[in-house]
Amino acid sequence: MILISLCFTTFLAFLFLNPLLKRTTTTKPNQPPSPWRLPVIGYLHQLSLHPHRSFRSLSLRLWSAHAPSLRSCPYPRFSKYISSSDVAHDVMKTHDLKFANRPKTKAVDIIINGGRDVAFSSYGEYWRQMKSLCTVHLLGRQMVRSFEKVREEEITSVIWKLEKQSSSSLPVNLSDLLLNMSNDVICRIAVGRKYSREENTSDFENQLRKVMELLGAFPVGDYIPGLAWIDKVRGLDRKMEEVSKTFVEFLERVVQEHVDEGENKETFDFVDILLIQLEKTNEFELERSDIRLIILEFFLGGTTTTFTAIDWAMTLVVRHPESMKKLQEEIQTYSRNKLYVPEEEVENMKYLKAVIKEVFRLHPPGPLSIPRQLSEDVKLKDMIIPAGTMIIVFINAWAIHRDTEKWGPYAEEFKPERHLDLPLNFQGQDFNFIPFGSGRRLCPDIDFATMLIEVGLANFVYRFNWRVETRPLGDDDGLKQTGMEVCHKFPLIAFPSLASFTI
């Protein structure tokens, strides 16, 4: 018994003294700053439910200005959190190739079949071929325009519901309507039919939400392999396997239905296009399982990003009546006495585009980017990020977008006017504004996401005036983290009334 106690005490002493001993020796110069760490868990105890906020606070605490990089230590993996646009430039442009890989995680391995999609696959020939396939045949500008009718029909469907509700003077759960609309548009484009609650398939939305939550979860085994058993005990492995099985079976049924239908169709969706490419592929061997993963990725990126963004857009506009009035006046200039604002007119609306940019500045689709992995030493500014251990780099777009040195003293406030004279776009060329990333890993479906958001917001603001009865929360109040996305903890409940100039 004494021997067991002695061994246990020695083990605990090692855990707590080992970090102290390491602090007295330096194996690499110019390491990024790191807050005080506990053994095993690093400084995970200092993180809140919203890690992007915690990392920004820790960075500001350690440096007099914005910390270019912050180091965490849940060993044997190390993470770097970049909160500076200058260092983000070095990561995503100067050293883009060195940071082009993705780390392998348990969620990616189980749900994404080891990362054989575009977003999570390792950089190499397979990734290049998959990205080329998607950008050329699925996500090109011409393809985006070809689905204009789908967007118009689903937006019009929401308008009809809002008109009916406005006559009753009752509030509407706008978040619920926007979620259904986003799901319906993405599903019709991807697989040719709806899977909304109205189709008695609400489980589809629940399964998508589970995938997003699991992809953004924290499996202990990813960082501390010796403690991987904890993930099994808390049921994380089982949840990942179950949701993976559900989507494999669902998407396989969808693909088989398209195969059985053949080419005798009036309209083609993404599955049809991919099946055609499956037969044409020569040098690049596209497999049926790859089709399932591409469609799953489009569901995840398209549905969640689109819904989160348009929900934030409507929330911010409703909370800022002066911005809503300016937006209505601009839209009325282009679309006076029309029942629907078409996409060709939306292209010319500068204030609308400024509103969308401001939404993405304050609430980027992923506050922390999908992590990048490094395999060799890189010098970023005055810091050396070493190879040898597993290095994972996160770009904190949320923090960069709120840097007062770039965006001024009112960086936390919703001010679309700031974008009217700034030549910013979503392509990641200005590293102070990177809502969709930059470089080789730039999000490929920007046009699909932004088009639905722009035309949807334009029509909902053009056709209706909006008000909320309860005291509006602050723009960042009531948040919840759902995997890699940050959305409202509470739905947007608002009162629509027909705008006078549309009657």
From Swiss-Prot:
One of its GO terms (molecular function) is monooxygenase activity. Its cofactor is heme. Heme binds at C443. Its EC number is 1.14.-.-. Signal peptide: none annotated. InterPro entries: Cyt_P450 (IPR001128), Cyt_P450_CS (IPR017972), Cyt_P450_E_grp-I (IPR002401), Cyt_P450_sf (IPR036396). It is a single-pass membrane protein. The chain crosses the membrane at residues 1-21. One of its GO terms (cellular component) is membrane. Keywords: Heme, Iron, Membrane, Metal-binding, Monooxygenase, Oxidoreductase, Transmembrane, Transmembrane helix. It comes from the Eukaryota. It is found in: Membrane. Gene3D superfamilies: Cytochrome P450. It is an enzyme of class 1 (oxidoreductase). PANTHER family: CYTOCHROME P450 71A2-LIKE (PTHR47955:SF15), CYTOCHROME P450 FAMILY 71 PROTEIN (PTHR47955). Belongs to the cytochrome P450 family. This is Putative cytochrome P450 71A28.
